[in-house]
C-alpha cells in the first residue's frame, strides 16, 4: 500500500463524508452528463473505499441511490477505476452544494464561505486530498504533497486555504490544469494534522527521523574515513622519508629529539598525531610532534 493510499484510508476509516468534503470531491472528480431523463453525475476514483463512502453519502444526505461501476485501466499500472453514477436529483445536489456554476464554467474557484471558515476549509482540504491528492513516500527522502486542480484559480484557492493553516503552499500551472504543492516535511506533517490523519503523521515523522539519523551516521562515518585516509597518507609520506634518511645517512645521525619520533612513526604508521604525542617518553603537544615531523621531511627533501 502506498503512503498516499494509507493516508486516504485512515481518513475514510474515521467518519462519513461531510458536506464540504463531498463538495470538494464532486467539484474535483465529478463529471456532468445529459440523458433523456435529465442531468447525470459521475464521480471517478481509484479508491474503492472512497467510492463506497460517496455511495453512502449520496444516500444519507440526499436519499439518492447511486450505482458503483468499475473497469480496469489499460495502462501499465492496470488500476481498477470506480465510477459512482447517478441520474437522480442531480440538479438539487449541485444546487445544495453550490456547484451548479462550477460545472458550467461560471465559477471555477472556491466558495468564499469556505475560504472564510476554518472548519469548512479544513473539511474542503480533506475532500480535495481524497479526490486528487498525493504524497510522495517519505522513505524516498524527497518530500512532496500535491493536490491537482483543473482550474488555476481553484489551485490558488487550495493554496489560500493551506496558507490559512500557516503552510507554505505554492501553485504550479501545467498544460492541463494546475497543482498546489507543499515541499517541506514539517508542512506536510502539519497538513496531515489539519485533515485528521494522525497515524499517518506519526508514521511520516518516524520515517523522517530514521532517515535523518542514518544520514547523520553516514556523514560521521564518511568524515571519520576521510580523516583516517588523510592520516594514513601523511603517515606514509613521512615513513618513506624516514626510510630514505635511514638508507642514506642512518637514523642515528638525526638529532636525538627527531630519532624517537621517527622510530615511533615507523612502528605505528596508523597512529594519529595525538597518539604519537602520547607515546613519546617525554609528553609533547600535537603541534610539537608536527614540528618534528616537518623537520624530518625537510631533511629527507634535502638529501
From Swiss-Prot:
GO BP annotations listed: cell division; regulation of sporulation
GO MF: DNA binding
Signal peptide range: none
UniProt keyword Repressor, yes or no: no
Keywords annotated in UniProt: Cell cycle, Cell division, DNA-binding
TM region positions: none
Residue ranges for the DNA-binding region feature of this UniProt entry: 272-303
InterPro entries given in the database record: Homing_endonucl, Sporu_reg_WhiA_N_dom, Sporulation_regulator_WhiA, Sporulation_regulator_WhiA_C, WhiA_LAGLIDADG_dom
Similarity comment text for this entry: Belongs to the WhiA family.
Function: Involved in cell division and chromosome segregation.
Record protein name field: Probable cell division protein WhiA
Organism: Streptococcus pneumoniae (strain Hungary19A-6)
High-level lineage: Bacteria, Bacillati, Bacillota, Bacilli, Lactobacillales
